[in-house]
Amino acid sequence: GNLISLQGRLDDDVAFLTGDAFRNDDFIILTTTDAFNAGDLVRISMDDTGLVTSDWAKGTVGQIIEIKDQRHDTLFLSEQLRLDLPLQRQPVIRKIDPVKYAGIECLKIVRGSNDAFQSNNISLEFASNCLINGVESDSANLAHIAVSSSSHVEVRNCYLHDSYDYGGGGKGYGILVQATSGDCLIENNIFKHLRHSMILQAGANGNVFGYNYSIEPYWTGTTLPSNASGDLVLHGNYVFSNLFEGNIGQQIVIDDSHGINGPFNTFFRNRLESYGIFMNNNPPSDSQNLVGNEVTSTVFTQGLYLLFGKDHFQYGNNIRGSITPVGTEELSDTSYYLTKKPPFLDDISQYPIIGTPNVFKSGKNSAAFNFTNGIFTRCGDDVISGNQSISEREVSVALYPNPTRGNFIINGLKPGLGIRLYDIMGKLIFQQEVVNGSINIDLSGFNNGLYFVNIMAAGGIVQTLKIVKMN
C-alpha cells in the first residue's frame, strides 16, 4: 500500500450550476449557495463524455478552487476558471474536506519490497496547501509521489529514483499529478531511472513543473528502445493548461495512451537531450504551446520534433541547432510563472537558462548542477512558496514572545495580507486581515501546544510561522 498518505474527503452533497460559466470567469451561479462559505475548497466537475477515455477518469475534467465570497445565488472564486462549463454538460460543485498545511520534509524513503497494488511511496488525495521538500525516495511501485484531487501542493528539492517495475499499467512514475489536481508546483527536483518522471493525466490543470532534471528514462514491455520512454509526459484523459518550464530531460511525449489531452499545455524553455519532442496521433492533441525549447541530440533516430494535430503555437524552438519555425530567433520572454530569478537559481549565472537567444546547449538548471556535484536533495534550506508572485513572498516579520503564555504579536506585515491561525489538528481558530502592519493574537483561552500561523496573500500561503502556547 501507500507508505505515507495524506487523505482528505469529498463531500457527498452536490449543488448544480444554473447557467453557463466560461473560461476566465471568477464566479458561478448555483441553485442554492446555503451550504457554501468563504474559504471552502470545492471541486467543480461536469459530464466529460468525449473528453476522457478511461472509466476511472470520468468526472475528473473540472477545477479545484477556493470560494472567495458568497452572495445570494453566486459564489465568487479565488481564481479564474480555466475551462468553459456549458450547462448542457451538467456542471456540479461539491465541497472538499481537505488535509491542509501538512508537510513532509528532510527524510529518506526506501520501499523495501513490491506489492501487487498500484501503491505510492507518498500519496496526497483531497489535500491543499501541502509541502514535500528535501525527500529522497528510493524504489517505487506506481509513483514515488502521487497528487490526486488536490490543489496548491508543492514538491521541491527532492530526489526520486528507481522502481520495482517499469512496465505498462502504471509503474515506475516519479511525480504523478492527476484527477483534477491544480495549482501545484513541482520545482527543482531530480529524477533518475524511471518510466515517466513527470506525468499528468485525468483532468490535471493549471500545474507548473519548473526547473527539474531527469535522466536515464527506462521502460519495459515495448518494442521501442528501452530509453525512449517520456520523462515529461501528458498522458491523456484531457489534461489542460499546464506549464513545463526550464526543465532538462530526455524527451517530451504528448501521448494518446488515454485519449486526447486538452488545450493550452505549454512547454517553455526546456531542453530535451535524447529523443526530443514527440506527439502521438491517434488521436492527436490540438492547441499545444511550444516556445523556446531545445532538442539537442544528433544521434540517428533521436533529436525528434514531431507534432500532429492543429492550432499549435510554436516559436523559437532550437531543433538540432536550427530555429523552428524559421524567423523566430528573437525570444525575450523569460518566465511564464516567475517575475524574477528565483533564489534557488542564485548560483546559475545565465537566466533564462535554456533557449534562444542563448548559445545552443549552454546553461544548466540548479537541479542538473546539483546532481553533477553529488547534491541530491536540499534539506533545511528556506522554502518559499512558489504559488504567489515574488512581491507577495517578500515578507519579513517578527513574532514574539515565543513561547507565549497568552498574547503574542506579529509585526512587519504588509496591509492587505491575511493571518490564519491553526491548531495542531489543522482546525482554523483565528483569522484577520492586516490593516496597519501589526496584529495581536490572544491564545489564553486555548490549550497548551504548537500552533501554526499562515500569512496569506491572494495567491495562497506566503509564509508559515510556528508559535508555542505554554503556561
Task: Give the label of every model feature segment.
Residues 1-66, 70, 78-79, 83-84, ...:
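Autoprocessing Asn-cyclization modules and mimics
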Residues 40, 46-70, 74, 100-196, ...:
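Right-handed parallel beta-helix
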